[in-house]
């Protein structure tokens, strides 16, 4: 952990049990030798044995001090105690190093050392610089800047369960400020462009969905190698760059995006504590956001598609309280509409019909897409929120796409291919819904590779066309969506990008090109609240955490309300302007338009040079 020069006069080794004579020469008052003893034979303050009595109560201690005046220590005694304390600290740190030797022994030497050699860290590493420094040499100003106490002491990962019962990764990080913990969301749905979540693929354990390999990669590779670099936890970009280079693959398939992202997020938490500020403020600094905007929530009320066995083709029907006065009021509007729908359905179909899905929405036995829209529209009216609440639809059209068409009866194994819809016909359904009902946003309107349909629908409406599966938080696909004007807003998910830095770069790219941003949850979420601070820190304008039920969903909404309370008069709710860029600061982002994403380097990381300073 420390590179301590044993030749330094302030770090004199005291490894023997015999007394060691030290001549302090010009010590005031005496030139006699003094003797230092190994601390194994004494405890703190053992020079004064009478001070070590068991004074268990304040009264006893007070009486003792009154009758036993403490003797003043001479300079030699002060030096002696400092030397003993220094020895104890060195031994304590050595014991921690020894504890990690077992983990370091399992690091694959050949592939990872080769990969690390490509990352230019050796010339700035404190160990390298200090190894050649003697007592007579002085460190340069740049070298002094990076010599600091090791910020990361312990990095420990474990396998936990997400809210669907599927294993995911959790990481503990210990610094001088304490313990920080993050659990990343997971999913068993494989997308072609998102970073790879590493699974064990052992049928005998969790049906092959265990994450012990990802946990092992953190405990034996990422953790020890990251600790060696002696990087401050506030150096988010440098740490993320290091882990990307350590993995060495484009989609993070070697170490696992679930492993890398978990470490990236826990570093952000520790970095916020190091800077003495809330997590959302730290994220604002990382993203260059000057003013804080609280998001409009997409509150899931009804589910269909693959989330339900009902007849609804689209996956989610949500409420957006765009006319609310603040975020707390928005949650009140969403919750009241949710429970009105629940009570209405229970009265009509029975209480068992309001089954709650993984996302917190209700699986209501409706057979028509229009039935769901009519039910929500009536709920908005009956609750008195006309003009204050609008409807958002997550079509998840990739699930409907078959043989070049869209099958709205895809749940029926005997559906007729002649009834498959073209992109144009499906677009007409969306446009009609926007005219007849208060629908303001369509998410994943088409298949993620149906670029022409995305661009056409975006040009035909001013309402929000939100891409989620379209880009999968992949920087290349985000750039392609910007170039083709496919949609006017993009969803960002934590575990799809791989690192917090990559997610922030995607956000900057979208904002600089006038796209809206929605920070989204996943089915297999955890009780971690990071997403709440993320959406506030980015001033994204929109957040999607599911329904106003289930602990992992409500916890995130509650955290945003706490942040709003903390901000007080400075809190600004996005409202109708949920797609607009936050005012008050520049979004320093490159406008990147790829010619052919298959043959381009991984922007913006192709020319990264790792620098500790």
What spans do the regions from the language model cover?
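Catalytic core of soluble alpha/beta enzymes
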Residues: 353, 363, 370-592
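Mobile "lid/hinge" segments at catalytic clefts and subdomain interfaces of large enzymes
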Residues: 191, 288, 292-360
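Intrinsically disordered, low-complexity transcriptional effector regions
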Residues: 1-79, 130-142
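Short beta-strand elements
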Residues: 169-177, 182-186, 299-321, 378-380, ...
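Metal- or metallocofactor-binding catalytic centers and their adjacent structured scaffolds
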Residues: 185-277, 286, 331, 361
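Basic DNA-binding helix
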Residues: 60-132
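Short, Gly/Pro- and small/polar-rich lid/capping loops
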Residues: 146-168
């Amino acid at each position: 952990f420390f590179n301590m020069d044993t030749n330094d006069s302030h770090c004199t080794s005291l490894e023997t049990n015999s007394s060691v004579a030290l001549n302090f020469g010009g010590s005031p008052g005496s030139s006699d030798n003094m003797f230092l003893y190994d601390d194994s034979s004494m405890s703190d303050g053992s020079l004064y044995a009478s001070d070590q009595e068991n004074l268990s109560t304040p009264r006893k201690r007070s009486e003792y001090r009154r009758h036993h005046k403490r003797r003043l220590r001479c300079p030699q005694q002060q030096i002696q105690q400092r030397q003993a304390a220094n020895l104890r600290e060195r031994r304590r740190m050595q014991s921690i190093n020894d504890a990690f030797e077992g983990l370091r022994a399992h690091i694959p030497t050949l592939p990872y050392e080769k990969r690390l050699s490509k990352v230019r860290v050796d010339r700035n590493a404190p160990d390298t610089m200090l190894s050649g420094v003697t007592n007579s040499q002085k460190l340069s100003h740049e070298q002094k800047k990076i010599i600091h106490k090791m910020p990361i002491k312990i990095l420990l990962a474990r396998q936990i369960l997400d809210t669907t019962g599927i294993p995911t990764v959790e990481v503990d990080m210990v610094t001088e400020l304490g313990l920080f913990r993050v659990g990343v969301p997971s999913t068993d749905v494989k997308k072609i462009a998102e970073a790879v979540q590493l699974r064990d693929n052992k049928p005998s354990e969790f049906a092959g969905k265990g994450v012990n390999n990802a946990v092992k990669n953190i405990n034996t590779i990422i953790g020890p190698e990251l600790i060696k670099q002696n990087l401050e936890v506030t150096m988010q970009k440098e740490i993320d760059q290091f882990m990307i280079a350590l993995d060495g693959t484009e989609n993070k398939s070697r170490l696992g995006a679930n492993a890398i992202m978990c470490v990236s997020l826990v570093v952000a938490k520790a970095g916020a504590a190091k800077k003495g500020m809330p997590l959302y403020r730290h994220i604002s600094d990382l993203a260059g956001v000057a003013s804080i905007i609280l998001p409009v929530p997409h509150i899931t009320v009804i589910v269909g598609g693959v989330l339900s066995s009902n007849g609804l083709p689209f996956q989610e029907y949500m409420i957006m309280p765009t006319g609310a006065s603040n975020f707390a009021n928005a949650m009140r509007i969403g919750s009241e509409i949710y429970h009105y729908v629940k009570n209405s359905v229970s009265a009509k179909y029975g209480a068992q019909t309001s089954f709650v899905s993984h996302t917190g929405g209700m699986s209501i036995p409706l057979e028509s897409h229009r039935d769901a829209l009519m039910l929500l529209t009536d709920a908005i009216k009956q609750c008195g929120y006309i003009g204050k609440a609008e409807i958002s639809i997550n079509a998840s059209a990739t699930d409907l796409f078959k043989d070049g068409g869209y099958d709205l009866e895809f749940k029926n194994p005997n559906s007729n291919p002649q009834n498959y819809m073209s992109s144009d016909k499906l677009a007409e359904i969306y446009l009609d819904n926007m005219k007849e009902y208060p629908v303001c946003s369509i998410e994943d309107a088409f298949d993620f590779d149906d670029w022409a349909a995305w661009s056409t629908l975006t040009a035909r409406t001013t309402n929000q066309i939100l891409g989620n599966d379209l880009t999968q938080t992949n920087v290349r696909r985000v750039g392609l969506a910007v170039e083709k004007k496919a949609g006017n807003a993009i969803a960002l998910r934590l575990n799809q990008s791989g690192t917090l830095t990559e997610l922030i770069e995607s956000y900057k790219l979208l904002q600089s090109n006038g796209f809206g941003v929605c920070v989204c949850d996943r089915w297999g979420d955890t009780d971690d609240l990071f997403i709440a601070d993320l959406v506030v820190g980015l001033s994204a304008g929109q957040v999607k955490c599911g329904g106003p039920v289930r602990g992992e969903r409500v916890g995130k909404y509650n955290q945003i309300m706490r942040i709003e309370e903390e901000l007080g008069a400075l809190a600004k709710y996005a409202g109708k302007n949920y797609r607009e860029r936050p005012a008050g600061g520049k979004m320093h982002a490159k406008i990147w338009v790829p010619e052919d994403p298959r043959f381009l380097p991984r922007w913006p990381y192709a020319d990264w040079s790792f620098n500790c300073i």
